[in-house]
C-alpha cells in the first residue's frame, strides 16, 4: 500500500471515532483540507445481503435531488425515432453497428450506455467489454428502455446507477465537495432512503449494517442510521 499524503494523514487525525448524524458527518467531511481539485463525494453502504442469491441483488438507479456535479458521457444504441429522441436529449453518441464496432475494438470513453430493446441483439455480444466495466445496459438498471430520450435526460441531470459488489456493499457518487452542505446531505439521504426501501423480503437479519461517506482523497466518516 502506498504512503498516504501529508494532507490525508492530517485529515485522519480529525476522523471521528464514533458514528455521527448525517448533518454532522457532512460538516466533518467538509472540514478536511481542500485539494486543488473539486473532490467527488461518495456514499458507501454495507448491506446484510447474500450476493449469491438472485433475490438479494441490490441494483437500480435514481436521480439525486441536486445532481452529482459531473456531466456524464452517455451513448445510446437506437434507430429511427428513438435515435432522434436520444440526440435531442443530449446523448453524446447515438448509433448501431458502427458504435458496436467501436466498442468491440476497445473504446469505452463514456459513463453510461443505454439501449432500446430492439438493439439488444447487437449489444449483447459487447458484454465481454462492457460487463467488467459496469457499462452493460440492463432492464433492471433502467438502461434498456424504449424511452431512451427520457433516460438520457435523467443521466444528464445527475442520475446514478448502483449495484452491490461481491461483498454486499453498495457505492455511489453523491456530489462534489464544493456543494453546499445541505445539498450534499439531501443527496445522501435520498440515496440511503432509496436503498432502504429496496430491502429484499428474504432478509431476516439486519439489512443496513453501516453507512459511511468520504471524498476522493479523504478518510471516511461513519453515519448513524
UniProtKB/Swiss-Prot annotation:
Entry annotated with the keyword Ribonucleoprotein: yes
Originating organism: Rhodopirellula baltica (strain DSM 10527 / NCIMB 13988 / SH1)
Entry keywords, A to Z: Repressor, Ribonucleoprotein, Ribosomal protein, RNA-binding, rRNA-binding, Translation regulation, tRNA-binding
Family of this protein: Belongs to the universal ribosomal protein uL1 family.
Complex formation: Part of the 50S ribosomal subunit.
Alphabetical GO biological process terms: regulation of translation; translation
PANTHER family: 54S RIBOSOMAL PROTEIN L1, MITOCHONDRIAL, LARGE RIBOSOMAL SUBUNIT PROTEIN UL1M
GO molecular function, one term: tRNA binding
Keyword Glycoprotein included in the entry's annotation: no
GO CC terms of this entry: large ribosomal subunit
UniProt protein name: Large ribosomal subunit protein uL1
